[in-house]
């Protein structure tokens, strides 16, 4: 049992609370409803309270045993609704682990892993016959679920500490966001959450078999969320690494994680991930289905796919990417593209359609899929299998034909009260981004948009977290509800631990930039708290309020390693003899001393002087045409 | 003489040509006018030709001796104009080296450095009595200078190779940029350059004492340029490091470099930098003037400042940041800011104005400054000393009052035919960026805008190259002509070699994203060439066409280190058994085989089927109001 030990020691690194931070719980209307926030204690005695995705891992008081999984936050809420039942579930099959990769598979090791963590293999629940257990179904019946209340408390956080920053009316008016059509209330109520879910403008991904999830919402009237992808592949990686990547990803702020495993042990990997995840987990079930048919796309069948959906729904996957918009009549539209079909799911389905010369079974069986989704409350993430793989292919007919189809499918899903979001590109130059949002809003009826980037240029391999963070920030501002991260390894290889972090931080920047631009009060206030700390030379507070306190501190210490410099009223850019912020403090004292009245009188005098000066020469405008 | 040897070995690292690349010269109308481009030879036999800022350093045929400086590209052009004269110039003074820092100054070492590279100390030129030697002055008289022709050839590059990518009409129309008011011709002529310079919409920073410069233009109708800052400070750094940083910065694509040194040996450092720089060098002369008065802002005088301008103009500095818009009547406007005055130059002048209760001597002596600028063709970079230091302070009255003043000063500068650009912020949330461009265009009459970022959020210390690349890309698209980079160390410490590179790459991404969005044909085509290489699994070409081939190759090799994988038709993301790009190639063959006619007929049949399907349930729209 070496592997779990290695894992536990890796995990201990990610369990450290953030500096000067502790987990705090906002109590809800019932004893088992408590919403976590991260309180950062500043050196001036103030507290700033931040949205916290990291789950119990950063709570020093909680004992974690990854072989048993996390406690089930939602356990009682689900059973109390009395519309679900336990059942034996589908039995575990060798094929579920991707056994077509038999040549590199170690059955002995798999058996050990499963035996060593048998608590992670749970008895599943499903809707009772005829019941629909989706959050949308409850919402449309006017029921405010504990999940909705949880989301409301979480989106608000502790508004008290923001008061100081929101009080300055002149400033608040000047920097007020441009919500670009979003309607973000000052205070999010549980009823508001219910209404957003009911009308399909937000989803709360929360499979009834994932009681460990801390509920969160994806919708344009909430904070912009980010998704991180993890997953082994045929070439590299291991179960332990993937679970640790999950904990690492949520530490840095991933709101959702997609498990894109394609290699061996994928069923057991998924058990480990879901049971240890406080954030919703998404998958692309066609990947596993393909493994079951040995990687031969044309051998896929509806039955194998359906069985895979049930397998994963029973494990607790919160949303499925389903590429049901890749229809046979659209495939030839990609033939003249610069980069064809680049979505893996899209090309699997394209290959299937071509091989059989038939319409996609995902499209034709869409209502059957809805029936499975609503029995577990799995949300749709309608995949954009025909998304552009280069700027040259952006916004073409293949892409938009699929998007319109996703709009049709959204209405079918909503007929079944199945929660739905829509995936978007990909590679889109800046000037073509807004059209993506406009088309999505128009055809998909405000279902949440969930985009990959988009990358704004194609020439930055090794830096596509940056080329895409630009597009992500812009489309987030425009109304996209969740941004799927891109790591520096995009197009080149598999992200390691540091790549995952780099991708997440870039996307936290993009999402926060979007929140600030939209006018989210919590976003603006965190910026202000850090700016104030920066201006007042509270170095520790500046680090601790940042997205990555460790890196900020390390960078600072490279130039000025002495502890004393962290309270000094200067920094390494200007040195001890001169500092612009120090001078500004003198300006402030000057203005206070002189009084604004005098300053304004002086301004008038100077303006007069300026007019004289300009009259003496400044106003003689020389035509700028060349003489000849 | 250990230091120069250390330097030479450092430099050899940055003299390696880029992989598969060689320097190529586009001949102009005279034998001494040859414009460098970097030709990248692809594995399929094609050549892609790129804009090249790296100067002779990446030309294996050129012998470099940093103690003698670069050859003077413009030497004959300047003397042939017969409007300048050599003169003895100002004598070197101990004070020029920042000797007020006497406690940490090593006079012996300085003497050695100067003696070991005495060729770098040149006899200066200036305009003959009554002459005006600015590019703007020539342009307004209808003269197309060699500098203007050089810029035209450089902006075009080799358009031949782009033909393939520009030929696809459907695509060209779909992805055509939105120039946001810019007017970028398909082919840049020397006459177009002249006209842009004449009307002040572009500048060619090219001091007559910097003949080594390879002329380039900054203007919204040319490619978006980037600036990198280097410079020692009172706390760290050395001359050798600064020169090597210059060569390193232009290798990665800096179009301009600002030397912001504030510490010891600043005069000699500047000689080294200018004589070895093929790109324009900018400075903030008030920094050196402050050194001369021992760091006491109130001791600054017009005479000391004027002498510093002449000192630097004689050395060949191409543009001066002058904070002449920081006027006494504006200073109290910053008193209620979250972060006051954060520009170093701005706070120096604010302190001076307060101490003397007098209007800024930079403002009052502005026409005297113009007289100096036009005698050497130093361009103005009118500094934004009151730029916001946080999102909370963005677009406030202090900032815009200064901007309007910079507009007034631009007209005075233009009266003297002095080339002028305008500096801009700083920290601006996304939704407030466009207003900055609008105000600048309105008040500054299309003089080129040169912004620092802007940073879109404040909570990313350690990652502000990313938070600002977002703002830089957006404002570049909106019409900003040059983007001043921000490194990961911003707000935290002094950038080292790797930070400089990270900052530059982030800004090359921003500038290129802006060029693509504006519709620059050269930008779009490079994206397309890389995308095509990516789609065709030409891994080496994908690396070599990227902004940083080394990093792309290294990232790829981490996962698949074998050389064989670089020609393999798969990558590490999907593995050898399945690959979306491989499937796309099958789609393409399928579409070609079936023929588009059949595909379209099939599409119609499918659409009919879809309509039937939808009629059977899809159209029953369930109202989404909750039941209760």
UniProtKB/Swiss-Prot annotation, chains A, B:
Positions contributing to Zn(2+) binding: 427, 491
One annotated GO molecular function: carbon-carbon lyase activity
Catalytic activity: 5-amino-1-(5-phospho-beta-D-ribosyl)imidazole + S-adenosyl-L-methionine = 4-amino-2-methyl-5-(phosphooxymethyl)pyrimidine + CO + 5'-deoxyadenosine + formate + L-methionine + 3 H(+)
InterPro entries: ThiC (IPR037509), ThiC-associated_dom (IPR025747), ThiC/Bza_core_dom (IPR038521), ThiC/BzaA/B (IPR002817)
Uppermost EC category: lyase
Gene Ontology CC annotation, any one: cytosol
Cofactor: record remark: Binds 1 [4Fe-4S] cluster per subunit. The cluster is coordinated with 3 cysteines and an exchangeable S-adenosyl-L-methionine.
Pfam families per the UniProt record, alphabetical: ThiC-associated (PF13667), ThiC_Rad_SAM (PF01964)
EC numbers for this chain: 4.1.99.17
Binding site for [4Fe-4S] cluster: 571, 574, 579
Record NCBIfam families: PRK09284.1, PRK13352.1, thiC
Record-stated family: Belongs to the ThiC family.
Protein name, as recorded: Phosphomethylpyrimidine synthase
Biological source species: Variovorax paradoxus (strain S110)
Phylogenetic placement of the source organism: Bacteria, Pseudomonadati, Pseudomonadota, Betaproteobacteria, Burkholderiales
Gene designation: thiC
């Amino acid at each position: 049992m070496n592997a779990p030990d290695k894992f536990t020691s890796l995990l201990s690194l990610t369990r450290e609370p953030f500096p000067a931070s502790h987990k705090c719980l906002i109590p809800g209307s019932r004893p088992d409803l408590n919403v976590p926030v991260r309180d950062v204690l500043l050196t001036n005695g103030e507290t700033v309270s931040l949205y916290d995705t990291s789950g119990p891992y950063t709570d020093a008081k909680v004992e974690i045993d990854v072989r048993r999984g996390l406690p089930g936050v939602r356990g009682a809420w689900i059973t109390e609704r009395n519309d679900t039942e336990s059942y034996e579930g589908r039995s575990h099959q060798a094929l579920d682990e991707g056994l077509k990769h038999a040549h590199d598979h170690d059955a002995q090791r798999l058996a050990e892993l499963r035996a060593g963590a048998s608590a992670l293999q749970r008895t599943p629940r499903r809707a009772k016959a005829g019941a629909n257990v989706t959050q949308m179904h409850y919402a449309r019946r006017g029921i405010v679920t504990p999940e909705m209340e949880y989301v409301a408390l979480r989106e608000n956080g502790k508004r008290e500490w923001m008061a100081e920053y929101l009080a300055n009316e002149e400033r608040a008016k000047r920097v007020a966001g441009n919500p670009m059509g979003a309607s973000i209330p000052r205070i999010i109520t549980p009823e508001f959450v219910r209404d957003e879910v009911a009308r399909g403008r937000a989803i709360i991904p929360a499979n009834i078999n994932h009681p460990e999830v801390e509920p969160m919402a994806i919708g344009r009237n909430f904070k912009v969320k980010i998704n991180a992808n993890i997953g082994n592949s045929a070439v590299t990686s291991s179960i332990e690494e993937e679970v640790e990547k999950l904990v690492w990803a949520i530490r840095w702020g991933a709101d959702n994680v997609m498990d894109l495993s394609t290699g061996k042990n994928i069923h057991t990997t998924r058990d480990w991930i879901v049971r240890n995840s406080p954030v919703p987990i998404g998958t692309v079930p066609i990947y596993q289905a393909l493994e079951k048919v040995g990687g031969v796309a044309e051998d896929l069948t509806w039955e194998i796919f359906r069985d895979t959906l049930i397998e994963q729904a029973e494990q607790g996957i919160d949303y499925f990417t389903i590429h049901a918009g890749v229809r046979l009549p659209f495939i030839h539209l990609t033939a003249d593209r610069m980069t064809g079909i680049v979505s893996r799911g899209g090309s699997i389905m394209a290959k299937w359609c071509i091989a059989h010369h038939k319409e996609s079974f995902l499209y034709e069986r869409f209502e059957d899929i809805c029936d499975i989704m609503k029995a577990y409350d799995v949300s749709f993430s309608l995949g954009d299998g025909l998304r552009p793989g280069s700027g040259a292919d952006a916004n073409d007919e293949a892409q938009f034909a699929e998007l319109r189809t996703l709009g049709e499918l959204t209405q079918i899903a909503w007929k079944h009260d199945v929660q739905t979001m829509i995936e978007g590109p990909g590679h889109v130059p800046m000037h073509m981004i807004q059209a993506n949002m406009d088309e999505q809003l128009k055809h998909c009826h405000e279902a949440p948009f969930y985009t990959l980037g988009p990358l704004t240029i194609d020439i930055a391999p090794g830096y596509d977290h940056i080329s895409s963070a630009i597009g992500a920030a812009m489309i987030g501002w425009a109304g996209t509800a969740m941004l799927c991260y891109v790591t520096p390894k995009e197009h080149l290889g598999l992200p390691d631990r540091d790549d995952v972090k780099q991708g997440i931080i870039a996307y936290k920047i993009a999402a926060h930039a979007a929140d600030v631009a939209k006018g989210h009060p919590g976003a603006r206030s965190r910026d202000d708290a850090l700016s104030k700390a920066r201006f007042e030379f509270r170095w520790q507070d500046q680090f601790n309020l940042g997205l990555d306190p460790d890196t900020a501190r390390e960078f600072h210490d490279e130039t000025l390693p002495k502890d004393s410099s962290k309270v000094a009223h200067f920094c390494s850019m200007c040195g001890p003899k001169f500092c612009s912020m120090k001078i500004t403090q003198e300006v402030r004292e000057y203005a206070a001393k002189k009084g604004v009245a005098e300053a304004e009188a002086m301004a008038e005098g100077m303006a007069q002087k300026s007019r004289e000066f300009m009259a003496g020469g400044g106003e003689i405008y020389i035509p700028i045409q060349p003489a000849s």
